[in-house]
Amino acid sequence: EFYSYKYRNFSTMIIIPAAIFVLLLFVGSFFAVRQNTVSSVGVVEPTVVIKRKNVNYDEGQVVTKYGQKWVAHVDQGGGISLMPVMKPKSKVKIVTYVTSDKISTIKKGQSLTFSVPTGDGLTRHLTGKVEKIGVYPVNMNKQNIYEIISTAKVNDENIKYGMQGNVTIMTGRSTYLKYLLDKVRNNK
């Protein structure tokens, strides 16, 4: 009976386990890694486009030119754009735009993930690298934005040219402790 009174008080049942939990969270923040990212919307585009005029192709027609298969797209002005037929392991260009306050964190060679939700409830992913960063902003919808061009390999036959999806660019990594300390320092 002596021990049951000793271990049933408030401090041993609530305060000590809570203090241990807070201590474990603090120690864990030294090791837990957080990824710094920039998010935007992107579009899948072909890496090469051949423009033709006065050619009699139909929309979606497959044409063989230069030893490669191309798919025809009829432009609004009546011209024809030939784009490479998309197949697994082929490269595509992902074009995205980022606001001027986030462009300074993006560098060439950083990894990028392009996510497209599909009708069946799944999400298709493409991973690639940043290839080009615009040197001067473009004014779109009364906002200055920079164009970012990256390349990715197609790993799914359901990815098509012109698909729009979410782009996440990984700009760095830091521990949660460093992240929280930076937030506290910036607020002062």
Curated annotation (Swiss-Prot):
<keyword id="KW-0614">Plasmid</keyword>
<keyword id="KW-0812">Transmembrane</keyword>
<protein>
    <recommendedName>
        <fullName>Uncharacterized protein in laf 5'region</fullName>
    </recommendedName>
</protein>
<keyword id="KW-1133">Transmembrane helix</keyword>
<keyword id="KW-1003">Cell membrane</keyword>
<dbReference type="GO" id="GO:0005886">
    <property type="term" value="C:plasma membrane"/>
</dbReference>
<feature type="transmembrane region" description="Helical">
    <location>
        <begin position="13"/>
        <end position="33"/>
    </location>
</feature>
<keyword id="KW-0472">Membrane</keyword>
